[in-house]
């Protein structure tokens, strides 16, 4: 393939190049059967500017001895060059920071490098200043240092995963999981989720209703139960008490934060007490507020967030309110800069069936009696299609920052990723391109009109807006933003160097629906695999199955238990020997919990995280009001979608979708 600046007679046609190596710069890829398309902003693995050394594995391909594979051993050479353990070749990375094609190197279970894999004995590295860079128009929209491209070595110790023609995302972070049954973990992995945060002890009434693992004894037992599963774990303790000692002992036992839930009590006094401990211990508070308004209204809860002039950060679960929270105006909290708002997936997006299924779900989850009028009035107060419609819009504006599942307690753990992209599709279909994507397209139009189109990295055939910014906004909702909210963004949540290689590969036609492979800590843990007795890997039944990273002792090495700062060292297993006066060992003790999975402290700056830190989802509406009689929602400062669509200050229309993508085309049931 040649560049416009260096035409050649042996030019490889774009379609042929995509067939051989996957799409490259300026090519577009449709996400499953949605209306969303992403466009590759830069190709660091080859493409128009550096074609000829693309790394491909297979018969007659490049990654072979004396060709693309170096002879350098894993320990490195005299020049300090050390081959990676695994290379993912030519993958289309979709992350909050961009849409690029690159080779990805993994070493010691972490992302070592993003850029160009090569053999230094036969290939020249790409100079740092010659890597193609995304062409951005928005102020501050730049690559983080940990996503900058570089060259890295493939050697005899390197495994190869073909990412060519496939999409690579970070593993999902689900912050609202009721730990009801072990099968949930398999469903999560099969959907591309690699970190689960929540609480529960099994199908007890307290766990089916609330995301809480209460007290030291239960916390220890649940950690023991989850030790052999290849997912990162964060447990939420019971925050519904004004007793600081009861809260602190749960932090010492290993919780990542607290859940205050109305079924246990969500009074202003409880919220204040829990936040005080959160501030002291540097953990997060997740809130399911008082739907019945028994102990106060929304203003009472909002006031409890503030102490000594500081607006303390709070992670609000299902901020729309159907999952719980002050009726009918819980959604107004998206206006607060200290509120980190999230949705749960049963209301995403608003369809003709959404309202109907919620009543039965609520009766089961919250232990209600359908024969008691007061119980049914409680259920009805939470189900408001008007606020669900506003939730659609607020997600597209970037005013609701996160998505989660509410697994088996009104939500589906295997559908968090899928519901996110269904929402994005609905909004694209309804309102057109985002203003940010329109802005990029406008720059291209100017370049074309002024005769610069041929020199511009995007030519006339791609002047129609892509959906890159919208896609980056939505992928951030279940990756980097929940990781930031719970202080684990230094380890997971994005495709950046230094982080755990918790990665998901997707075939574009199955994007967001059925993953191709899931890497957990650099090891393949889940994948689409056919009949184990077949002669090859693809014969039916072709299903998501656990592979070696999910078996034996592998999960103990490729996954973490996240705990509060300073707690990991107390819980990690250490062997202590007791000797007598003659130096003879008389006793061997194990300190900590004696578990094999490593406990890791979360970051210490978690209490300073605000909505302004939410990647591409930091929008604070000028105003948002819910009419207490009609439940209609009015949003000020609404700037989503096509610039010709005016919603600022207008009542949000109730728009029920009758058909969504990623549905019956992919599933029998």
Predicted regions and their residues:
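Active-site microenvironment of metallo-dependent hydrolases
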Residues: 1-144, 189, 194-195, 384-402, ...
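Divalent-metal coordination cores built from histidine and acidic residues
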Residues: 2-75, 130-169, 185-270, 275-278, ...
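Buried hydrophobic positions in well-ordered alpha/beta secondary-structure cores of metabolic enzymes
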Residues: 91, 109, 165, 176, ...
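Flexible loop/turn segments at secondary-structure boundaries
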Residues: 95-96, 101, 113, 120-121, ...
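Glycine-rich, histidine-containing beta strand-loop boundary motifs that form or position
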Residues: 106-108, 115-116, 181-183, 191, ...
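Residue-level marker for buried hydrophobic side chains located in beta-strands
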Residues: 159, 171-173, 285, 403
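Di-metal (Zn2+ and/or Mg2+/Mn2+) metal-binding site signature of metallo-dependent hydrolases
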Residues: 166-188, 630, 634-635
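Active-site core of metal-dependent hydrolases
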Residues: 257-471, 486, 528
């Amino acid at each position: 393939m040649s560049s416009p600046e260096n035409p050649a007679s042996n030019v490889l046609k774009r379609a042929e190049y995509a067939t051989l190596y996957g799409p490259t710069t300026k090519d577009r890829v449709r996400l499953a059967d949605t209306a969303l398309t992403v466009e590759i902003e830069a190709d660091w693995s080859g493409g128009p500017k550096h074609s000829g050394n693309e790394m491909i594995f297979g018969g007659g391909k490049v990654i072979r001895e004396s060709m693309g594979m170096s002879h350098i051993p894993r320990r490195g050479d005299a020049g300090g060059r050390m081959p990676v353990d695994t290379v993912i070749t030519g993958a289309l990375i979709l992350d909050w920071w961009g849409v690029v094609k690159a080779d990805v190197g993994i070493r010691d279970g972490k992302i070592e490098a993003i850029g160009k894999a090569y053999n230094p004995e036969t290939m020249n590295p790409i100079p740092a200043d010659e890597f193609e860079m995304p062409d951005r128009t928005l102020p501050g929209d730049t690559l983080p240092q940990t996503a900058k491209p570089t060259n890295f070595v493939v050697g005899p110790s390197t495994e190869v995963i073909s990412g060519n023609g496939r999409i690579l995302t970070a593993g999902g972070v689900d912050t609202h999981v009721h730990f009801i049954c072990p099968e949930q973990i398999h469903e999560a992995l099969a959907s591309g989720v690699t970190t689960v945060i929540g609480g529960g002890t099994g199908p007890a009434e307290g766990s089916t209703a609330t995301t809480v693992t209460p007290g030291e004894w239960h916390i220890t037992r649940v950690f023991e139960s989850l030790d052999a599963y290849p997912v990162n774990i964060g447990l939420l303790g019971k925050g519904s008490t004004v007793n600081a000692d009861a809260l602190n002992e749960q932090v010492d036992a290993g919780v990542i934060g607290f859940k205050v839930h109305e079924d246990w009590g969500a009074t202003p006094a409880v919220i204040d007490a829990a936040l005080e401990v959160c501030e002291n211990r540097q953990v997060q508070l997740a809130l399911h507020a008082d739907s019945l308004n028994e102990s106060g209204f929304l203003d009472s809860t909002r006031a409890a967030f503030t102490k000594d002039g500081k607006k303390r950060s709070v992670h609000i679960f299902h901020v729309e309110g159907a999952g719980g929270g002050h009726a009918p105006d819980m959604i107004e909290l998206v206006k607060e800069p200290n509120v980190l708002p999230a949705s749960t997936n049963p209301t995403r997006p608003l369809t003709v069936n959404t309202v109907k299924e919620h009543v039965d779900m609520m009766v089961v989850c919250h232990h209600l009696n359908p024969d008691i009028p007061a119980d049914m009035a409680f259920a009805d107060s939470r189900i408001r299609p008007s606020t669900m419609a506003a939730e659609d819009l607020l997600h597209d504006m970037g005013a609701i920052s996160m998505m989660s599942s509410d697994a088996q307690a009104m939500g589906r753990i295997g559908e968090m990723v899928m519901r996110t992209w269904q929402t994005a599709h609905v909004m694209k279909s309804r309102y057109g391109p985002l203003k940010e994507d329109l802005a990029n397209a406008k720059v291209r139009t100017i370049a074309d009109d002024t005769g610069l189109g041929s020199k511009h990295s995007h030519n006339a055939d791609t002047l129609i807006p892509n959906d890159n910014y919208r896609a980056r906004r939505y992928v951030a909702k279940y990756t980097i933003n929940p990781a930031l909210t719970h202080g684990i963004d230094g380890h997971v949540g994005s495709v950046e160097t230094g982080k755990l290689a918790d990665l998901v590969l997707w075939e574009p036609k199955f994007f967001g629906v059925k993953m191709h492979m899931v890497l957990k800590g650099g090891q393949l843990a889940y994948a689409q695999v056919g009949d184990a007795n077949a002669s090859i890997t693809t014969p039916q039944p072709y299903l998501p199955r656990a592979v070696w990273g999910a078996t034996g002792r592998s999960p103990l090495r490729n996954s973490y238990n996240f705990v509060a700062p300073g707690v990991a060292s107390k819980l990690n297993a250490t062997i202590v020997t007791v000797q007598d006066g003659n130096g003879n060992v008389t006793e061997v003790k194990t300190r900590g919990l004696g578990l094999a999975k490593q406990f890791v402290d979360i970051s210490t700056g978690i209490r300073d995280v605000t909505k302004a830190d939410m990647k591409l989802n930091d929008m604070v509406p000028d105003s948002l009001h819910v009419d207490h009689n009609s439940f209609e929602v009015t949003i000020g400062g609404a700037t989503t979608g096509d610039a010709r669509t005016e919603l600022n200050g207008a009542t949000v229309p109730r728009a029920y979708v009758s058909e969504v993508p990623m549905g019956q085309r992919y599933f029998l049931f």
